Amino acid sequence: MTRPVRSLREAASFVDRVGIALVFPRDGIPLPSLWEAVAGDQQVEWVIEKEDGTKDFSPEMERVWSWKDELPAQKRACAGKHLRGWATLVSLKVLPSLYALTGLHAREDGFRQTELSSLEREVAEAVLVLGPLSSPELRQAIGCEDTARVNRALDLLQRKLVLTKAGTVTQGQGWPAGTYDVLARRYKLGRLPDEEVARLDIARIINAPDAPTLARTTGWNKREAARIFGALA
């Protein structure tokens, strides 16, 4: 029986041990998840019903929901929609390899060399100049009231590893809002590995059973996934 993760320190150690983890599991994706690490081998509900009939997070879900934000806030792991747009946790030891696949320079303004939409560039520049911002703060900073468009730009910038989660900020009402920072500023990436070496590193961490699963997990095209999978055999 696997001992469940019970503290933020253990959650950080879990991410360091596996290299890349999803926050929640996905069918057909061989990566471990923080949820599974917290729940352990038991069948655990995400939501519980209280005596008054209202529903709330289970203790396990409370931990996952808090730690997914506390880990990046304390820089114990990189967090964001960095893999296929899924909420992902990346060990800081693995981050240089994942970042190397973007082709970006490891400096805070490295995104200026890549192709971005006008809104993506505006969002990235605002975060670069003003520091970590939430979506509402970003909308105010760039003068765009379209929540869906700004959130879409944030999602795409995370997938491109331009922006990353930096924690949360309390709002006047409702849930705390996630904040975002420039990834290459928030974390010291050092000297990036060669792209081919980085691709092999990421494939080893994923440890997919076959090339199609590797392609599905990474978003690489089928030919590239087959080539890398073959190189690992």
Locate predicted features.
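Long, low-complexity intrinsically disordered regions
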Residues: M1-A233
